[in-house]
């Protein structure tokens, strides 16, 4: 709908009157300039769920700025977590775009449920920066030890991730044995160490490279990796959407 055409204003109004959901990802203020403030949208249709996805949110100082996934990854600290040779690097997946969309979906579904129970619509102000910043959190509750329940051990052929448990006693037992475990790991390959730990009832997993993941039988069996032929005849390993209906 091109809102620069006055006739389209009436069209959008009629669409809002009948719609359950309105989703838009224009710069904040775009709809407002044409009279479609959140308040006016709810006045047109009190039951509508209006979800606005933007880079920085309705009222932020940077609200009027455009936002791209890479920009948000830098501002949210994601690129600081994914350094390559010490240099901040964008994740392969457009994670800021993806998570903003996912959170918008969850919020919209929750708002629809609320609407069905109360008859009241909702305005969802969802910022990409908020969604991307949320991804960087390393602890998931107020326990100062909660982020310390995993350890990474260096092996002959890479690294192994070990879960030591979230309670204080488990952490204490691990601290007593950690030096010996680290020494043992240095002389052991990942597969042998993981097997030995699992036999003792300890959760462990090899930390794999992307190339190893693509070749992993478990990944292949699930069909998440598939081969596709390019126009030049070359064959590429690609990843399909994990949703399989």
Place the predicted regions along the sequence by residue.
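Acidic, glycine-rich segments within the central catalytic cores of soluble metabolic enzymes
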Residues: 59, 68, 73-196, 204, ...
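C-terminal capping/gating helix-and-loop segments adjacent to ligand/active sites or protein-protein/ligand interfaces
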Residues: 237-245
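General beta-strand structural signal in soluble alpha/beta enzymes
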Residues: 24, 52, 206-207
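Short beta-strand segments
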Residues: 2, 51-52, 127
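Alpha-to-beta junction loops
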Residues: 18-19, 46-48, 199-204, 219
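Rossmann-fold NAD(P)-binding glycine/threonine-rich loop
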Residues: 32-80
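Conserved beta-strand edge residues that scaffold enzyme active sites
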Residues: 5, 29-30, 55-56, 167, ...
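A structured beta-alpha segment of the ubiquitous adenosine-cofactor-binding alpha/beta core
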Residues: 1-43, 186
């Amino acid at each position: 709908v091109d809102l620069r055409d006055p006739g389209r204003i009436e069209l959008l109004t009629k669409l809002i009157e009948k719609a359950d959901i309105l989703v838009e990802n224009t710069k904040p203020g775009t709809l407002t300039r044409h009279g479609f403030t959140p308040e006016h949208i709810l006045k047109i249709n009190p039951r509508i769920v209006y979800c606005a996805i933007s880079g920085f949110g309705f009222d932020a100082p940077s609200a009027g700025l455009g936002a791209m996934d890479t920009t948000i990854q830098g501002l949210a600290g994601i690129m600081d977590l994914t350094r390559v040779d010490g240099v901040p690097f964008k994740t392969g997946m457009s994670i800021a775009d993806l998570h903003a969309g996912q959170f918008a979906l969850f919020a919209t579904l929750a708002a629809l449920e609320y609407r069905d129970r109360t008859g009241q619509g909702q305005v969802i102000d969802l910022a990409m920066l908020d969604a991307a910043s949320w991804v960087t959190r390393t602890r998931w509750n107020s326990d100062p030890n909660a982020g310390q329940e995993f350890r990474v051990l260096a092996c002959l052929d890479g690294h192994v991730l070990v879960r030591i448990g979230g309670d204080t006693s488990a952490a204490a037992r691990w601290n007593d044995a950690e030096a010996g475990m680290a020494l043992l790991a240095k002389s052991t390959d990942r597969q042998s160490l993981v097997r030995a730990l699992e036999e003792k009832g300890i959760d462990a997993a090899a930390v794999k490279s992307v190339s190893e993941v693509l070749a992993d039988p478990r990944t292949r069996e699930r069909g998440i990796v598939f081969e596709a032929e390019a126009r030049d005849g070359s064959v590429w390993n690609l990843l399909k959407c994990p949703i399989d209906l």
